[in-house]
Amino acid sequence: MEDSHKSNTSETAPQSGSTVQAAHISHIAQQVSSLSESEESQDSSDSIGSSQKTHGILARRPSYRKILKDLSSEDIRGRKGDGENPGVSAVTSMSVPTPIYQTSTGQYIAIAPNGALQLASPGTDGVQGLQTLTMTNSGSTQQGTTILQYAQTSDGQQILVPSNQVVVQTASGDMQTYQIRTTPSATSLPQTVVMTSPVTLTSQTSKTDDPQLKREIRLMKNREAARECRRKKKEYVKCLENRVAVLENQNKTLIEELKTLKDLYSNKSV
């Protein structure tokens, strides 16, 4: 009886141990599965959150079509504002009276608003010989610069005068210059005409007939010719010196050759 009881107890002991191990293994498997499920759920929640964040960023970022639409609407509004307020950029035009001046010789000078000068001489039937001169406005140029313009005389000759001077030819044939002074401010008008001392302008033909000028021109030409002659002489002398040096070298070589020939002849004769 005792032996049978011992065998029964020995059989039941390994069975109970195996059941405990199986329960422990199942518990560990449940924990591992729960951990993997929690990790998967966390990964899925993280991916969902990141996708939601990127979607929100893209939703907040304006599209190119919206940007172009905003720019076009701003341009249209700016154009409408310019059209509604044309007086802001428009320049108001006002009529300016034309000043007329009379010189001591009886000649009339009228200055138009556009800068043109009108010259006229008095006659028996009123103003005669109206002549218009267009002057260059030098208000925007730098100080110290002089602008020249052509002025045509009665005989058809053209002369160069500064842009702030007017040349007037009188009835006697003399030519007088008038200086125009313009104020630097842009609002004031150039209405002042100051008469300077009369300057007699002679033609080019009268200048060439001057004997003093002819003499100076002749002396200048003579000086240039003498300078050129001296230069050619120096070049010729230098060329001759080079030739002499070459001939001296040739003479030395010939003397040396003659000496060698004499030595050879004397040796052969002995």
Swiss-Prot record:
Q: What is its main location?
A: nucleus
Its cellular-component GO annotations read: ATF4-CREB1 transcription factor complex
Any one GO BP annotation for this protein: regulation of transcription by RNA polymerase II
Keywords, A to Z? Activator, DNA-binding, Isopeptide bond, Nucleus, Phosphoprotein, Transcription, Transcription regulation, Ubl conjugation
> Which positions bear Phosphoserine?
63, 197
Q: Where is this cross-link: Glycyl lysine isopeptide (Lys-Gly) (interchain with G-Cter in SUMO2)?
A: 207, 214
- Residue limits of the KID domain? 31-90
Q: Where is this region: Basic motif?
A: 214-238
Region feature Disordered, mapped onto this chain:
1-91
Superkingdom, according to UniProt? Eukaryota
Q: Which Pfam families match?
A: bZIP_1, pKID
Q: Per its database record, what is this protein's job?
A: This protein binds the cAMP response element (CRE) (consensus: 5'-GTGACGT[AC][AG]-3'), a sequence present in many viral and cellular promoters. Mediates PKA-induced stimulation of CRE-reporter genes. Represses the expression of FTH1 and other antioxidant detoxification genes. Triggers cell proliferation and transformation.
What binding partners and quaternary form does the record give? Answer: Binds DNA as a dimer. Interacts with HIPK2 and CDK3. Interacts with MOTS-c, a peptide produced by the mitochondrially encoded 12S rRNA MT-RNR1; the interaction occurs in the nucleus following metabolic stress.
- Stated name of the protein: Cyclic AMP-dependent transcription factor ATF-1
What is the organism of origin for this protein? Bos taurus
